[in-house]
Amino acid sequence: MSNKRTSVEQLISCPICSRKVFFSLINSHLDICGKEKSKPSSRPQTVSSLLAGPKKRKQANSEKFIDLENKDHEIKPGLKSESDDIEIVENESKRFKAAPSTDFAKSIVEPASSRDQLHNDYESRWLQKISHLPLSEKLRPKELRDYVGQQHILSQDNGTLFKYIKQGTIPSMILWGPPGVGKTSLARLLTKTATTSSNESNVGSRYFMIETSATKANTQELRGIFEKSKKEYQLTKRRTVLFIDEIHRFNKVQQDLLLPHVENGDIILIGATTENPSFQLNNALISRCLIFVLEKLNVNELCIVLSRGIALLNKCRKQVWNIENPLKLSRSILEYVVDLSVGDTRRALNMLEMIEVSTRERKADEEELSIDDVRDIIKNNSSNGLNTYYDPKGDNHYDTISAFHKSIRGGDENASLYYLARMLQGGEDPLYVARRMIRIASEDIGLRDSSLLPLAVAAHDAVMKVGLPEADLALAQCCVALARAPKSVELYRAWKKLRAMMSENMYSLASSEIPMHIRNAPTKLMEELGYHKGYKYNPDYIEGKVQQDYFPKEVLEKCPNKTDLKFLDGKHLGDKEDPDLRQSYQG
């Protein structure tokens, strides 16, 4: 049978056994079913057995996964598929399903070779259909039980989101997390699972999903979706789940357009974003949605995904690409790929696909791949090396610069250097880092070592004149010098206190008149009006000391406690003692 089909062949029901069979195979299947139907049953059938029907598929916790805790484990070819069912999707309105391995199907006495042949035909057609897709798309889960990760919201014990979908309910929500953690897959599975739950329990609503992206959707398209959702509910009582990828790219007008339709239930909004919603989304929209934070997948979870990818690639090798030599990767190689992926499932699968393509011509008798082999493959096919997820305008930008500043303030020169390296590798603007170090020199070192401010300015000039990568050491030098320097926040606290008093016009600090004797008198008229009159020029006196007020008279009169005007208290640091530090000394 040819695997090169231009379209999906229709599945029809067998009139004898009710199984789904491809149209071209129905005649041979009827011959087998007819012969077996005429044979006497090997065991008596009761009414209850006839009514029982096919048994439910085993739950996810009964699946046998690879022992990923075994460090010496190797992924072997021919791993069991995550699901015996083969699902063929032509478009959103047509979905065909064949389940040749259910207990009900197995109860039909059929030669093993015929069953295997049918199963192989189904699988070959499915593999041929998806062979052009990226591996991440091939492995996209079809059932919620196949979804990997995010147990903090999907756990059956205390997962908030799981409680909703168990009741067949989907709330409007924002899925916030880094790339490659499964935001789109989760949204699709929520819609499917909630609809199934509501059908089984007769509680909740039925749903259908419309997907769009904020990078291409406009107000006209959104209005069309809202109108379609109303008509859909009137005709079928199905509620519309509107999934918007990269929702943070919507402007204020587009976000406001969503508000009334989310409010009155015309749509259920699921937005996916890699940016902090509190920075990028309107407060009104946030108040109408639940915020779920999706976390990066850990090593064990990513190894599960990679093992599934290897199993699928080996099937494609054998049945589509006619390559007999299977791909074998050890646990240590999987962990190496996981480390490079930085928690991004899509990136990990892309690297796995790169390894698979690069090893198709390897002979079966060659030595198994080592970490050095994989490192060379990735290095030769990636000009940029390791690319960590770092958005110069997103949360990582603010989180990393905050960690950098606090590490310098705490005097940890190694941590300071580490965060500097993370920012530069992630593509942060080096001038932004240099400007922050200028601020640190005044805020955290201040009067204890005034030479650090010119050093920070010099580092900024070095970046301006030389640029990266040559100026990286100038930034590192300034970073370490700031971390090692003695700290003083006397100036910072004094300035902060004064600004707070000025903002409230305390003691008329912001509105009082400047004293006449310390005003300038550049003209004769101003001199006649009393400007500069009575001013004592300090250099004319011994040690420059004179009795003279510099604060406005109104301020001095309104301030009963003159110590409030002493903004600089002479204390470089505070007087608190850290109990954790005391315990570490005692230990």
Curated annotation (Swiss-Prot):
GO biological process: chromosome organization; DNA replication, Okazaki fragment processing; DNA synthesis involved in DNA repair; DNA-templated DNA replication; regulation of DNA repair
First-listed, main subcellular location of the protein, grouped into a coarse class: nucleus
Alphabetical list of Gene3D superfamilies matching this protein: 1.10.8.60, 1.20.272.10, DNA polymerase III clamp loader subunits, C-terminal domain (1.10.3710.10), P-loop containing nucleotide triphosphate hydrolases (3.40.50.300)
Binding site for Zn(2+): 14, 17, 29, 33
Disordered, as annotated region: 35-62
Location in the cell: Nucleus
Protein name: DNA-dependent ATPase MGS1
Phylogenetic classification of the source organism: Eukaryota, Fungi, Dikarya, Ascomycota, Saccharomycotina
